[in-house]
Amino acid sequence: MVTVYILYSKKADRYYIGQTSELENRLRRHNRGGSSYTKSGTPWKLVYREKFETRSEAMKREKKLKNAKNLEYIKRVIHSSRNELKSE
């Protein structure tokens, strides 16, 4: 399984979109400053998660989210029924 995720940094007031097969490890790396793009925004909070069977499917979804470049669209996605965090 591959997960597309959205992180939010209150400190930086911005979102980060990514995909990984190891979500917990990836989130730890983001919060330890292991990614140059997210380093300045720690701590990051996981606000959206959606799982896919293949890397190809996940990459398509990630690209669609990243290309949106519309904050309102990203917020709607976070609050949508596709967000697997809502079912926990």
Name these PLM-found stretches.
Residues M1-P43, R49-F52, M59-L71, R76-E88:
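GIY-YIG nuclease catalytic motif and its immediate N-terminal context
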